[in-house]
């Protein structure tokens, strides 16, 4: 089993539990160059809010999309957009990534922005 399969296995366990609870979730995905965040409905079929370092609004604020500063900007932006959509409480879906570095920075910025999880 390689590193990617291990991460996907962890992600599958988390998503199965969140699907069982029908919880609105904040899903995070990261690559070497970018980080993406989506608020997904409890049924799992609708994206209610999204933010990423690919967007021009974020790219104008940060030079590099693959660092903690960029993750903090995305975290604040996703919290702002989720609150605008009427969402206060979410379940954090780290997609099998360790809660460290950019994933942690995004989560803490989203909490500072007003999301509860």
Curated annotation (Swiss-Prot):
Q: Name one Pfam family in it.
A: Ribosomal_L18p
User: Any coiled-coil ranges, and where?
Assistant: none
Gene Ontology BP, a term: translation
Q: What are the protein's UniProt keywords?
A: Ribonucleoprotein, Ribosomal protein, RNA-binding, rRNA-binding
What HAMAP family does the record point to? Ribosomal_uL18_B
User: Record's family?
Assistant: Belongs to the universal ribosomal protein uL18 family.
Q: What is this protein called?
A: Large ribosomal subunit protein uL18
> The organism's lineage?
Bacteria, Pseudomonadati, Pseudomonadota, Betaproteobacteria, Rhodocyclales
Gene behind the chain: rplR
């Amino acid at each position: 089993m390689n590193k990617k399969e291990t991460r996907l296995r962890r992600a599958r366990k988390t998503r199965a539990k969140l699907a069982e609870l029908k919880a609105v979730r904040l899903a995070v995905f990261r690559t070497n160059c970018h980080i993406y965040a989506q608020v997904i409905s409890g049924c799992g079929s609708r994206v209610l809010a999204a933010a990423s370092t690919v967007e021009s609004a974020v790219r104008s604020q940060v030079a590099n999309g693959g660092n903690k500063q960029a993750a903090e900007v995305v975290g604040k932006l996703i919290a702002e957009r989720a609150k605008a959509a009427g969402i206060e409480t979410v379940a954090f879906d780290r997609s099998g990534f360790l809660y460290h570095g950019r994933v942690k920075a995004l989560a803490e910025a989203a909490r500072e922005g007003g999301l509860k999880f």
